[in-house]
Design a protein with these regions (language model features):
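Noncatalytic alpha-helical scaffold of FAD-dependent oxidoreductases
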Residues: 1-213
Length: 213
């Protein structure tokens, strides 16, 4: 995944699926991986266009052609994505990629209780705000991340990490709208930044949550 995005960077494109543990593209397809940005970009299920698979008897199967609209036959791509190698070995993958956003903003908001954080998340999704990433950590997990990743300025409280993609104005408006919703449920210490260094540190802490625990 990281190698793919390094290759795509100069083309202005990126592959958005970002699971908690780094993995190969083949492994991500085999396990139908998702990640923090599934709220906007979906999971591997929605982002694999076709596969080449070798079955147990040696047959080579191409699960789909280039035509985007086809109602002929079984949806073999969806069948193999998530099959964990039980139906065949994936040898080639055709993926959907996206344009790198003009602006990326990350934000953090903390809550007094888990119910308020969950209610905030639900309302944000129901409102239709195109949040790129949204990850909820309870107080125990947040405490572990603070200790392990040396996150400064945060308390051991239920916390939501956000990321917004779009134009500079659009990302800012999304962040402000989410902040207003969070404050309705008692959200506090809402902080947002567009600096790459700060964004990377925040999401790296999320990736390291397993080790932090």
């Amino acid at each position: 995944r990281k190698q793919l995005n390094d290759f795509l960077r100069d083309t202005g494109l990126f592959f958005p699926i970002d699971p908690g543990a780094d993995a190969s593209i083949g492994g991500m397809a085999a396990t139908r991986a998702s990640g923090t940005n599934a709220v906007r970009y979906g999971t591997m299920r929605e982002n694999v266009l076709s596969l080449t698979v070798v079955t147990a008897d040696g047959r080579i199967v191409q699960t789909a052609r280039r035509a985007r609209k086809s109602a002929a036959g079984y949806d073999l791509t969806r069948l193999f994505v998530g099959s964990e190698g039980t139906l065949g070995i994936i040898t080639e993958i055709r993926l959907k990629v996206y344009g790198i956003p003009e602006s990326i903003t990350s934000a953090v908001c903390q809550f007094e209780d888990l119910e308020s954080a969950v209610s905030t998340s639900i309302l944000i999704v129901q409102t239709g705000i195109p949040v790129a990433r949204m990850e909820l950590l309870d107080d125990v997990q947040m405490g572990a991340c603070i200790s392990y990743s040396k996150l400064e300025g945060y308390e051991e409280k239920p916390t939501i990490f956000f990321e917004f993609h779009g134009t500079e104005t659009g990302a800012k408006e999304q962040a402000e709208t989410v902040q207003a919703i969070a404050e309705e449920f008692g959200g506090s210490a809402f902080q947002w930044t567009s600096k790459m260094e700060d964004r990377n540190k925040l999401w790296q802490a999320r990736h390291d949550a397993y080790y932090a625990a």
